[in-house]
Amino acid sequence: MNWSRLREILDYETGILFGQTIEEIELAVMKYVSEYRDAVLVNNVMDEIRRTVTKPWTLMEICGGQTHAIVRYGIDQLLPPEIELVHGPGCPVCVTPLELIDKALIIASQPDVIFCSYGDMLRVPGSGRDLFSVKAAGGDVRIVYSPLDAVEIARENPEKQVVFFAIGFETTAPPNVMSVLQARSLGLTNYSILVSHVRVPPAINAILSSPTSRVQGFLLAGHVCAVMGYHEYPLLVDRYQIPMVVTGFEPLDIVQGILETVKLLEQGKVEISNPYARVVTYEGNIAAQEHIAQVFEECDRKWRGIGTIPMSGWQLKPEFDAFNAERKFDVGEIKAEESSLCIAGQILQGMNKPQGCPAFGTLCTPEHPLGATMVSSEGACAAYYRYGRVTINV
Protein backbone atom coordinates (compact mmCIF):
# COMPACT_ATOMS: atom_id res chain seq x y z
CA MET A 1 0.00 0.00 0.00
CA ASN A 2 1.15 3.54 -0.78
CA TRP A 3 1.18 4.88 2.79
CA SER A 4 2.19 8.40 1.82
CA ARG A 5 -0.80 8.60 -0.51
CA LEU A 6 -3.08 7.17 2.18
CA ARG A 7 -1.81 9.76 4.64
CA GLU A 8 -2.54 12.50 2.09
CA ILE A 9 -6.05 11.19 1.46
CA LEU A 10 -6.86 10.90 5.14
CA ASP A 11 -5.44 14.33 5.91
CA TYR A 12 -7.65 15.79 3.21
CA GLU A 13 -10.76 13.81 4.08
CA THR A 14 -10.84 14.23 7.84
CA GLY A 15 -8.56 17.16 8.54
CA ILE A 16 -7.44 15.60 11.82
CA LEU A 17 -4.58 13.27 10.99
CA PHE A 18 -1.69 15.61 10.22
CA GLY A 19 1.65 14.34 11.46
CA GLN A 20 0.44 10.97 12.69
CA THR A 21 2.38 7.72 12.45
CA ILE A 22 1.48 4.82 10.17
CA GLU A 23 0.16 2.87 13.17
CA GLU A 24 -2.04 5.80 14.14
CA ILE A 25 -3.29 6.07 10.57
CA GLU A 26 -4.17 2.36 10.54
CA LEU A 27 -6.20 2.84 13.70
CA ALA A 28 -7.85 5.90 12.18
CA VAL A 29 -8.81 3.88 9.10
CA MET A 30 -10.53 1.38 11.36
CA LYS A 31 -12.29 4.12 13.31
CA TYR A 32 -13.20 6.57 10.57
CA VAL A 33 -13.70 4.33 7.52
CA SER A 34 -14.05 0.61 8.19
CA GLU A 35 -16.85 0.72 10.74
CA TYR A 36 -18.82 3.04 8.48
CA ARG A 37 -18.92 0.29 5.85
CA ASP A 38 -20.10 -2.39 8.27
CA ALA A 39 -23.02 -4.22 6.63
CA VAL A 40 -24.63 -5.17 9.94
CA LEU A 41 -24.67 -1.57 11.15
CA VAL A 42 -26.02 -0.35 7.80
CA ASN A 43 -28.81 -2.96 7.84
CA ASN A 44 -29.73 -2.00 11.40
CA VAL A 45 -30.22 1.61 10.31
CA MET A 46 -32.15 0.45 7.25
CA ASP A 47 -34.50 -1.48 9.53
CA GLU A 48 -35.08 1.66 11.57
CA ILE A 49 -35.81 3.63 8.39
CA ARG A 50 -38.44 1.04 7.44
CA ARG A 51 -40.02 1.28 10.89
CA THR A 52 -40.03 5.08 10.79
CA VAL A 53 -41.36 5.94 7.33
CA THR A 54 -45.14 6.13 6.83
CA LYS A 55 -45.41 8.55 3.89
CA PRO A 56 -43.69 9.02 0.52
CA TRP A 57 -40.73 11.41 0.66
CA THR A 58 -38.34 12.74 -1.99
CA LEU A 59 -34.83 13.47 -0.75
CA MET A 60 -31.89 14.97 -2.61
CA GLU A 61 -28.26 14.15 -1.91
CA ILE A 62 -26.39 17.26 -2.98
CA CYS A 63 -22.95 15.78 -3.59
CA GLY A 64 -21.77 13.62 -6.47
CA GLY A 65 -19.57 11.62 -4.12
CA GLN A 66 -22.68 10.67 -2.18
CA THR A 67 -24.45 9.75 -5.43
CA HIS A 68 -21.67 7.34 -6.35
CA ALA A 69 -21.70 5.75 -2.90
CA ILE A 70 -25.48 5.35 -3.04
CA VAL A 71 -25.35 3.63 -6.44
CA ARG A 72 -22.18 1.66 -5.76
CA TYR A 73 -23.48 0.13 -2.54
CA GLY A 74 -27.09 -0.19 -3.73
CA ILE A 75 -28.40 1.98 -0.91
CA ASP A 76 -31.33 3.29 -2.94
CA GLN A 77 -32.39 -0.28 -3.77
CA LEU A 78 -32.46 -1.22 -0.08
CA LEU A 79 -34.67 1.71 0.91
CA PRO A 80 -38.42 1.24 1.37
CA PRO A 81 -40.49 2.26 -1.68
CA GLU A 82 -41.78 5.35 0.12
CA ILE A 83 -38.35 7.01 -0.13
CA GLU A 84 -37.05 8.34 -3.44
CA LEU A 85 -33.53 9.71 -3.77
CA VAL A 86 -32.86 12.27 -6.51
CA HIS A 87 -29.42 13.49 -7.42
CA GLY A 88 -28.19 17.06 -7.01
CA PRO A 89 -25.70 19.32 -8.80
CA GLY A 90 -22.77 18.67 -6.45
CA CYS A 91 -20.37 17.44 -9.12
CA PRO A 92 -17.83 20.20 -9.87
CA VAL A 93 -16.73 18.74 -13.19
CA CYS A 94 -20.35 18.37 -14.30
CA VAL A 95 -21.33 21.99 -13.71
CA THR A 96 -18.23 23.66 -15.19
CA PRO A 97 -19.72 25.68 -18.07
CA LEU A 98 -19.04 24.72 -21.66
CA GLU A 99 -17.78 28.22 -22.46
CA LEU A 100 -15.06 28.01 -19.81
CA ILE A 101 -13.96 24.60 -21.06
CA ASP A 102 -13.65 26.11 -24.54
CA LYS A 103 -11.51 28.89 -23.05
CA ALA A 104 -9.36 26.25 -21.37
CA LEU A 105 -8.89 24.53 -24.73
CA ILE A 106 -7.76 27.76 -26.36
CA ILE A 107 -5.32 28.59 -23.56
CA ALA A 108 -3.95 25.04 -23.38
CA SER A 109 -3.28 25.07 -27.13
CA GLN A 110 -0.85 27.99 -26.91
CA PRO A 111 2.81 26.97 -27.36
CA ASP A 112 4.16 28.83 -24.31
CA VAL A 113 1.58 27.35 -21.89
CA ILE A 114 1.72 24.40 -19.53
CA PHE A 115 -1.90 23.68 -18.66
CA CYS A 116 -2.47 21.76 -15.41
CA SER A 117 -5.70 20.11 -14.32
CA TYR A 118 -7.22 17.33 -12.30
CA GLY A 119 -7.62 14.21 -14.42
CA ASP A 120 -11.42 14.28 -14.69
CA MET A 121 -11.40 17.55 -16.61
CA LEU A 122 -9.27 16.21 -19.46
CA ARG A 123 -12.12 14.10 -20.83
CA VAL A 124 -14.94 16.60 -20.42
CA PRO A 125 -16.11 17.61 -23.90
CA GLY A 126 -16.03 21.22 -24.96
CA SER A 127 -17.84 22.38 -28.08
CA GLY A 128 -15.78 20.16 -30.35
CA ARG A 129 -12.95 18.49 -28.44
CA ASP A 130 -11.45 17.98 -24.99
CA LEU A 131 -8.14 18.59 -23.22
CA PHE A 132 -6.91 15.11 -24.12
CA SER A 133 -7.31 16.12 -27.76
CA VAL A 134 -5.19 19.20 -27.13
CA LYS A 135 -2.55 17.04 -25.47
CA ALA A 136 -2.61 14.58 -28.38
CA ALA A 137 -2.11 17.49 -30.78
CA GLY A 138 1.08 18.53 -28.96
CA GLY A 139 -0.21 20.80 -26.21
CA ASP A 140 1.55 20.60 -22.85
CA VAL A 141 -1.38 19.43 -20.73
CA ARG A 142 -0.53 17.81 -17.41
CA ILE A 143 -2.53 15.99 -14.76
CA VAL A 144 -1.74 17.15 -11.24
CA TYR A 145 -3.15 16.13 -7.87
CA SER A 146 -2.84 19.54 -6.23
CA PRO A 147 -2.63 23.16 -7.39
CA LEU A 148 0.58 23.37 -5.36
CA ASP A 149 2.07 20.91 -7.86
CA ALA A 150 1.25 23.44 -10.57
CA VAL A 151 3.00 26.18 -8.58
CA GLU A 152 6.10 23.99 -8.42
CA ILE A 153 5.90 23.43 -12.19
CA ALA A 154 5.76 27.21 -12.66
CA ARG A 155 8.82 27.64 -10.44
CA GLU A 156 10.73 25.04 -12.44
CA ASN A 157 9.67 26.47 -15.82
CA PRO A 158 10.04 30.27 -15.64
CA GLU A 159 9.98 30.55 -19.44
CA LYS A 160 6.47 29.04 -19.58
CA GLN A 161 3.07 30.29 -18.50
CA VAL A 162 1.56 27.71 -16.14
CA VAL A 163 -2.22 27.68 -15.80
CA PHE A 164 -4.17 25.60 -13.29
CA PHE A 165 -7.84 24.81 -13.99
CA ALA A 166 -9.32 25.79 -10.62
CA ILE A 167 -12.74 24.15 -10.58
CA GLY A 168 -14.77 22.91 -7.67
CA PHE A 169 -17.01 23.70 -4.75
CA GLU A 170 -16.01 25.15 -1.41
CA THR A 171 -13.99 22.02 -0.66
CA THR A 172 -11.27 22.71 -3.21
CA ALA A 173 -11.18 26.47 -2.76
CA PRO A 174 -8.60 26.52 0.09
CA PRO A 175 -5.80 24.75 -1.85
CA ASN A 176 -6.49 26.90 -4.91
CA VAL A 177 -6.29 30.02 -2.76
CA MET A 178 -3.08 28.78 -1.17
CA SER A 179 -1.56 28.23 -4.62
CA VAL A 180 -2.14 31.89 -5.47
CA LEU A 181 -0.73 33.07 -2.15
CA GLN A 182 2.29 30.82 -2.51
CA ALA A 183 2.93 31.95 -6.09
CA ARG A 184 2.77 35.56 -4.92
CA SER A 185 5.17 34.91 -2.04
CA LEU A 186 7.60 33.24 -4.46
CA GLY A 187 7.35 36.18 -6.85
CA LEU A 188 6.10 33.99 -9.70
CA THR A 189 4.68 35.98 -12.58
CA ASN A 190 4.10 32.93 -14.77
CA TYR A 191 1.40 31.24 -12.67
CA SER A 192 -2.34 31.82 -13.00
CA ILE A 193 -5.59 29.98 -12.39
CA LEU A 194 -8.65 29.61 -14.61
CA VAL A 195 -11.41 29.85 -12.03
CA SER A 196 -14.74 28.04 -12.07
CA HIS A 197 -15.58 27.86 -8.38
CA VAL A 198 -19.19 27.38 -7.36
CA ARG A 199 -21.00 27.44 -4.03
CA VAL A 200 -23.60 25.01 -2.70
CA PRO A 201 -26.12 27.23 -0.79
CA PRO A 202 -27.10 29.36 -3.83
CA ALA A 203 -27.56 26.16 -5.87
CA ILE A 204 -29.91 24.74 -3.25
CA ASN A 205 -31.79 28.03 -3.25
CA ALA A 206 -32.13 27.86 -7.05
CA ILE A 207 -33.42 24.28 -6.92
CA LEU A 208 -35.98 24.98 -4.20
CA SER A 209 -37.20 28.20 -5.82
CA SER A 210 -38.14 26.30 -8.98
CA PRO A 211 -41.85 25.48 -9.25
CA THR A 212 -40.90 22.04 -10.59
CA SER A 213 -38.89 21.07 -7.51
CA ARG A 214 -40.07 17.89 -5.75
CA VAL A 215 -37.37 17.90 -3.07
CA GLN A 216 -38.68 17.62 0.50
CA GLY A 217 -35.40 17.14 2.34
CA PHE A 218 -31.68 17.58 1.68
CA LEU A 219 -28.64 15.49 2.50
CA LEU A 220 -25.99 18.21 2.70
CA ALA A 221 -22.44 17.61 1.48
CA GLY A 222 -20.27 16.78 4.48
CA HIS A 223 -16.98 17.84 2.91
CA VAL A 224 -18.32 21.24 1.93
CA CYS A 225 -19.64 21.72 5.46
CA ALA A 226 -16.28 20.61 6.89
CA VAL A 227 -14.77 23.71 5.26
CA MET A 228 -17.63 26.20 5.47
CA GLY A 229 -19.65 24.90 8.40
CA TYR A 230 -23.43 24.84 8.07
CA HIS A 231 -24.29 28.30 9.34
CA GLU A 232 -25.51 29.37 5.87
CA TYR A 233 -28.24 26.73 5.71
CA PRO A 234 -30.70 27.64 8.51
CA LEU A 235 -31.87 30.58 6.37
CA LEU A 236 -32.75 28.16 3.56
CA VAL A 237 -34.43 25.78 6.00
CA ASP A 238 -36.63 28.61 7.27
CA ARG A 239 -37.32 30.04 3.81
CA TYR A 240 -38.45 26.79 2.21
CA GLN A 241 -39.62 24.94 5.33
CA ILE A 242 -37.73 21.73 4.64
CA PRO A 243 -35.21 19.85 6.79
CA MET A 244 -31.54 19.55 5.90
CA VAL A 245 -29.09 17.03 7.33
CA VAL A 246 -25.28 17.22 7.16
CA THR A 247 -24.26 13.85 5.73
CA GLY A 248 -21.01 12.00 5.13
CA PHE A 249 -19.97 9.71 2.31
CA GLU A 250 -19.63 6.21 3.69
CA PRO A 251 -22.63 3.83 3.56
CA LEU A 252 -23.40 4.17 7.27
CA ASP A 253 -23.10 7.96 7.08
CA ILE A 254 -25.55 8.08 4.20
CA VAL A 255 -28.21 5.83 5.71
CA GLN A 256 -27.90 7.72 9.01
CA GLY A 257 -28.45 10.95 7.08
CA ILE A 258 -31.49 9.45 5.37
CA LEU A 259 -32.88 8.20 8.69
CA GLU A 260 -32.43 11.59 10.35
CA THR A 261 -34.11 13.36 7.42
CA VAL A 262 -37.04 10.94 7.42
CA LYS A 263 -37.48 11.35 11.18
CA LEU A 264 -37.63 15.12 10.82
CA LEU A 265 -40.13 14.87 7.96
CA GLU A 266 -42.34 12.35 9.75
CA GLN A 267 -42.36 14.52 12.88
CA GLY A 268 -43.07 17.68 10.90
CA LYS A 269 -39.87 19.32 12.13
CA VAL A 270 -38.20 21.98 10.01
CA GLU A 271 -34.60 22.21 11.16
CA ILE A 272 -31.01 21.37 10.34
CA SER A 273 -29.25 18.40 11.91
CA ASN A 274 -25.63 17.26 11.96
CA PRO A 275 -25.07 13.51 12.51
CA TYR A 276 -21.68 13.96 10.78
CA ALA A 277 -20.30 15.75 13.83
CA ARG A 278 -17.08 13.71 13.87
CA VAL A 279 -15.95 15.83 10.91
CA VAL A 280 -18.22 18.89 10.69
CA THR A 281 -18.77 21.77 13.11
CA TYR A 282 -21.29 24.58 12.86
CA GLU A 283 -18.56 27.17 12.23
CA GLY A 284 -16.44 25.04 9.88
CA ASN A 285 -12.76 25.69 9.24
CA ILE A 286 -12.38 29.36 10.14
CA ALA A 287 -8.78 29.59 8.91
CA ALA A 288 -9.75 28.20 5.51
CA GLN A 289 -12.67 30.62 5.26
CA GLU A 290 -10.41 33.56 6.08
CA HIS A 291 -7.95 32.60 3.35
CA ILE A 292 -10.80 32.21 0.85
CA ALA A 293 -12.12 35.66 1.76
CA GLN A 294 -8.63 37.10 1.33
CA VAL A 295 -8.35 35.98 -2.30
CA PHE A 296 -11.88 35.35 -3.63
CA GLU A 297 -15.07 37.37 -3.84
CA GLU A 298 -18.58 36.18 -4.64
CA CYS A 299 -19.91 36.51 -8.18
CA ASP A 300 -22.67 35.29 -10.47
CA ARG A 301 -21.69 31.96 -12.02
CA LYS A 302 -23.04 29.93 -14.91
CA TRP A 303 -23.62 26.24 -14.18
CA ARG A 304 -23.45 23.83 -17.08
CA GLY A 305 -26.89 22.54 -17.97
CA ILE A 306 -28.58 24.79 -15.42
CA GLY A 307 -27.81 28.41 -16.26
CA THR A 308 -26.57 31.41 -14.32
CA ILE A 309 -27.22 31.39 -10.58
CA PRO A 310 -26.72 34.77 -8.86
CA MET A 311 -23.82 34.99 -6.41
CA SER A 312 -23.19 31.26 -6.70
CA GLY A 313 -19.49 31.43 -7.53
CA TRP A 314 -16.16 32.85 -6.53
CA GLN A 315 -13.75 34.87 -8.60
CA LEU A 316 -10.35 36.36 -7.85
CA LYS A 317 -10.39 39.77 -6.24
CA PRO A 318 -9.02 42.61 -8.40
CA GLU A 319 -5.78 42.76 -6.38
CA PHE A 320 -5.05 39.22 -7.59
CA ASP A 321 -5.68 39.94 -11.28
CA ALA A 322 -2.07 39.01 -12.06
CA PHE A 323 -3.07 35.41 -11.31
CA ASN A 324 -6.32 35.52 -13.30
CA ALA A 325 -5.89 33.40 -16.43
CA GLU A 326 -9.01 34.85 -18.05
CA ARG A 327 -7.43 38.30 -17.91
CA LYS A 328 -3.92 37.15 -18.75
CA PHE A 329 -5.14 35.29 -21.84
CA ASP A 330 -7.80 37.47 -23.39
CA VAL A 331 -9.64 34.96 -25.56
CA GLY A 332 -12.79 37.08 -25.78
CA GLU A 333 -16.38 36.03 -25.30
CA ILE A 334 -17.29 32.50 -26.30
CA LYS A 335 -20.77 31.24 -27.07
CA ALA A 336 -21.35 27.52 -26.95
CA GLU A 337 -24.37 25.24 -27.17
CA GLU A 338 -24.92 21.93 -25.44
CA SER A 339 -25.89 18.81 -27.32
CA SER A 340 -29.66 18.70 -27.72
CA LEU A 341 -29.52 15.00 -26.80
CA CYS A 342 -28.01 15.60 -23.35
CA ILE A 343 -30.36 16.01 -20.38
CA ALA A 344 -27.60 16.52 -17.81
CA GLY A 345 -29.20 19.76 -16.65
CA GLN A 346 -32.37 17.92 -15.66
CA ILE A 347 -30.38 15.23 -13.87
CA LEU A 348 -28.31 17.80 -11.95
CA GLN A 349 -31.50 19.44 -10.66
CA GLY A 350 -33.15 16.20 -9.58
CA MET A 351 -35.78 16.49 -12.32
CA ASN A 352 -34.76 13.29 -14.08
CA LYS A 353 -32.43 10.31 -13.73
CA PRO A 354 -29.92 8.80 -16.15
CA GLN A 355 -32.37 6.10 -17.24
CA GLY A 356 -34.65 8.89 -18.44
CA CYS A 357 -32.13 9.91 -21.11
CA PRO A 358 -32.62 8.24 -24.51
CA ALA A 359 -28.90 8.60 -25.27
CA PHE A 360 -27.74 6.86 -22.09
CA GLY A 361 -25.48 3.90 -22.80
CA THR A 362 -25.92 4.14 -26.56
CA LEU A 363 -25.00 7.52 -28.00
CA CYS A 364 -23.55 8.58 -24.65
CA THR A 365 -20.95 6.38 -22.91
CA PRO A 366 -17.83 7.10 -20.84
CA GLU A 367 -15.77 6.52 -23.98
CA HIS A 368 -17.92 8.91 -26.05
CA PRO A 369 -19.71 11.22 -23.59
CA LEU A 370 -22.23 13.82 -24.65
CA GLY A 371 -22.09 15.59 -21.30
CA ALA A 372 -19.99 15.92 -18.20
CA THR A 373 -22.24 13.76 -16.02
CA MET A 374 -21.00 10.73 -18.00
CA VAL A 375 -17.34 11.74 -17.62
CA SER A 376 -16.78 12.75 -14.03
CA SER A 377 -15.99 10.28 -11.29
CA GLU A 378 -18.79 12.05 -9.39
CA GLY A 379 -21.29 12.24 -12.27
CA ALA A 380 -24.64 10.48 -11.84
CA CYS A 381 -24.65 9.06 -15.38
CA ALA A 382 -21.15 7.64 -14.92
CA ALA A 383 -22.25 6.00 -11.66
CA TYR A 384 -25.30 4.38 -13.22
CA TYR A 385 -23.25 3.19 -16.20
CA ARG A 386 -20.35 1.90 -14.14
CA TYR A 387 -22.48 -0.07 -11.71
CA GLY A 388 -24.87 -1.44 -14.33
CA ARG A 389 -28.00 0.11 -12.94
CA VAL A 390 -29.92 0.72 -16.17
CA THR A 391 -31.36 -1.54 -18.84
CA ILE A 392 -30.32 -0.04 -22.17
CA ASN A 393 -32.93 -0.08 -24.90
CA VAL A 394 -31.38 -0.53 -28.35
Label for each model-derived stretch:
Residues 56-59, 190-191, 268-277, 303-304, ...:
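Flexible, glycine/charged-enriched surface loops at secondary-structure junctions
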Residues 85-87, 139-147, 185-202, 216-219, ...:
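Short, acidic/small-residue loops that bind anionic groups at enzyme active sites
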Residues 256-346:
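Internal helical hairpin/lid segments
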Residues 156-166, 171-222, 227:
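Active-site histidine-anchored catalytic micro-motif
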Residues 62, 87, 116-119, 164-167, ...:
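Short beta-strand segments
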Residues 215-277:
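A conserved active-site cap/scaffold subdomain adjacent to cofactor or substrate pockets
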